[in-house]
Regions:
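Bacterial N-terminal signal peptides that target proteins for export
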Residues: 1-9
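A short, hydrophobic C-terminal helix/tail in secreted or cell-surface proteins
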Residues: 264-282
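Generic structural signal for beta-strand residues in well-ordered domains
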Residues: 15, 262-264
Length: 288
């Protein structure tokens, strides 16, 4: 009898849904620790430096259900501790009174950046390639879409920005990835790549504080010199004002020399086709 009760208890426990993980953030100013959180296969980190206030950056976990990345490093233009959801305000942010960044200024001619958060990593790669996964999120969605109040970020490898919309040369930004704003909801750009979490639109829909965020993107560069030192500068800042926060979530272990989304070789596709054809023939024979 006792054995049956134990088996029933185990069965019920397995049948119950697991509690959803919630996004948590642990702030740090240790650049090496942040860099080591990101490093993956085929990449060796030799040094790292950080520009940022005490609570501006850190590590995160439990975010898979919210943004599609479970854990990694968060860089913000304000306070990383404001990132966990649910979204309770359209105006979360921290004004730090710190300087902007010249490389980010160059991405938005005519505007000035503030409160820059910069993680610079010197590394080598054993293939000449680098890939990593990330999500960009902001409190400036959706009210400031198509305005000049757009926080800015960039991933500069040896000075070249690779924070681009997949398959294009267009930088990822609030104005380039959105579903419009409350005053012009039909005026979206790359809406399929955007996730709306705005209270004005009936949110929150995701367990994160930001009003909107992109899909998981993969940044990449090929043709680097194998074994040579290269530097990547991961930077984000307020632009136009210092009021609302934005963030970049970088996936743990995704700084890799191996493409996480490889395109199958033609021979592999041919073998897959033959396998499916054989499966279909086998099923027809059984039916006969």
């Amino acid at each position: 009898m006792k054995k049956k009760l134990t088996q029933l208890t185990i069965a019920l426990a397995l049948a119950l849904p697991l509690p959803a993980m919630a996004l948590t953030v642990t702030t740090t100013t240790d650049a090496t620790s942040l860099a080591n959180t990101l490093v993956g296969s085929g990449v060796t980190i030799t040094s790292a430096t950080l520009t940022g206030a005490a609570n501006q950056q850190g590590t995160f976990s439990g975010a898979a259900g919210a943004i599609g990345i479970d854990s990694g490093v968060i860089l913000t233009s304000g306070d990383a501790r404001l990132a966990p959801g649910p979204n309770g305000s359209d105006g979360d942010g921290a004004s730090l009174g710190t300087a902007g960044d010249a490389d980010l200024n160059a991405l938005i001619p005519g505007f000035t950046t503030f409160d820059a958060n910069v993680l610079s990593i010197t590394f080598t790669t054993n293939t000449g390639n680098l890939f990593f996964s990330y999500v960009f999120a902001s409190e400036e969605y959706n009210e400031f879409v198509n305005s000049s109040f757009n926080d800015v970020f960039g991933f500069f490898i040896d000075g070249v920005n690779i924070a681009l919309i997949p398959g294009t040369n267009t930088p990822v930004s609030i104005n380039n990835v959105n579903c419009g704003n409350p005053y012009n909801p039909a005026g979206g750009t790359n809406c399929a790549l955007f996730n709306n979490n705005d209270l004005q639109d009936g949110g929150p829909f995701f367990d994160i504080a930001y009003d909107g965020f992109t899909n998981v993107f993969t940044a990449s560069i090929t043709g680097l010199t194998i074994g040579a030192s290269h530097t990547i500068k991961l930077a984000i800042a307020d632009a136009g004002d210092t009021v609302l926060d934005s963030a970049v979530f970088l996936k743990a272990g995704s700084f890799s020399s191996v493409d996480p989304n490889p395109v199958p070789e033609p021979a592999t596709l041919a073998l897959l086709g033959l396998g499916l054809a054989g499966l279909g023939l086998s099923r027809r024979r059984k039916a006969a």
